[in-house]
Amino acid sequence: MARYIGPKCKLARREGTDLFLKSGVRAIESKCNIEAAPGIHGQRRGRQSDYGTQLREKQKVRRIYGVLERQFSGYYKQAAGKKGATGENLLQLLECRLDNVVYRMGFGSTRAESRQLVSHKSISVNGQTVNVPSYQVRAGDVVAVREKAKNQLRIVQALDLCAQRGRVEWVEVDTEKKSGVFKNVPARSDLSADINESLIVELYSK
């Protein structure tokens, strides 16, 4: 399955919520009518079945983190095999992806841009270049922009944008050195309350 490269507003309208696919310079509502379904006429949303609600929640989370269907299924199996709540384990695995950590630290303005930085070998982990977006970052790991990329305008702008919206508490960043520490894996209470992971667990449990 190919990665989606079409209009980001279309996905936000499909899920009826901000998926944080845009930089956040302007509020998503000023760019996308997320209350309306996709299409020219933005037809009214019909009443969903339980299955439809569960599926939409899975698609929403998958699109927020930019993960393909097969990858997402793999993360779920991994989460189900770990101790603790499967839904929380799933979100933590997604949060520990390198492209997501790069985004959380503010080196990329979106997760898609952060994924590109990783793929283009602009990011190092503990001093070693890593170009795999799905690489699992561990507590205490140092994630940094490599010397060759430190002066890229998009990284400078992304850091400014992150300073405006605020940085999450589980990362610590030196903006001058463009380096940060992944202090700890976030607890469920640290993550978005707009995600209902129990619906995803129900979907995969069928």
Curated annotation (Swiss-Prot):
One term of GO molecular function: structural constituent of ribosome
Domain S4 RNA-binding: 96-156
Entry keywords, A to Z: Ribonucleoprotein, Ribosomal protein, RNA-binding, rRNA-binding
Keyword Zinc: no
Domain of life, source organism: Bacteria
Pfam families: Ribosomal_S4, S4
GO-annotated biological processes: ribosomal small subunit biogenesis; translation
CDD domains: S4
Gene Ontology CC, one term: small ribosomal subunit
Complex and partners: Part of the 30S ribosomal subunit. Contacts protein S5. The interaction surface between S4 and S5 is involved in control of translational fidelity.
Role of this protein: One of the primary rRNA binding proteins, it binds directly to 16S rRNA where it nucleates assembly of the body of the 30S subunit. With S5 and S12 plays an important role in translational accuracy.
Family: Belongs to the universal ribosomal protein uS4 family.
Stated name of the protein: Small ribosomal subunit protein uS4
